[in-house]
A protein has these predicted regions:
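C-terminal and inter-domain tail/linker signature
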Residues: 1-140
Length: 140
């Protein structure tokens, strides 16, 4: 599966091209809003989402039949943005399931600003490696 092309069609809200990536019985979970979609529901939710979108794929990790992506998504006017971490489970090079975690970008809460905590690249790598290990059943 070409995950770069998949994200391109997600952002372009191209229903016909998106459908080609999925197994017939695939499903998608949006955990932050407790939503569970079959393929048709997911494509409808994505393609009918208001606005015009763009973004960039910031990171991709692969392990067996699993692909993990971190993407930055925003409207074309860049008035706000989101980050999404997606776990793709594949079967015969098609998407069997996606588990996604969407979060709106913003400022740190006031109580934490004085801590001046920044997410370093090393910490981001460690977090993604731990997530990949958990998904692959590897003990760290």
């Amino acid at each position: 599966m070409d995950v770069i092309e998949f994200w391109r069609y997600v952002l372009e809200q191209d229903a016909d091209r998106l459908r080609e990536f999925f197994c017939e019985d695939a499903y998608v979970n949006w955990h932050c809003t407790n939503e569970h979609f079959n393929v048709n529901e997911y494509i409808r939710a994505n393609c009918e989402y208001p606005g015009e979108w763009t973004g960039e794929l910031e990171r991709t990790e692969k392990a067996g039949d699993m692909i993990i992506t971190a993407a930055h998504v925003y409207p074309k006017d860049k008035s706000w943005s989101l980050h999404v971490t997606s776990f793709f489970k594949l079967e015969d090079s098609k998407i069997k399931s996606i588990d996604e975690y969407w979060a709106e970008d913003g400022e740190a809460p006031e109580w934490r600003k004085s801590l001046k905590v920044k997410l370093s690249n090393n910490l981001l790598v460690a977090v993604l490696q731990a997530m990949l290990a958990v998904c692959s059943g590897i003990k760290m």
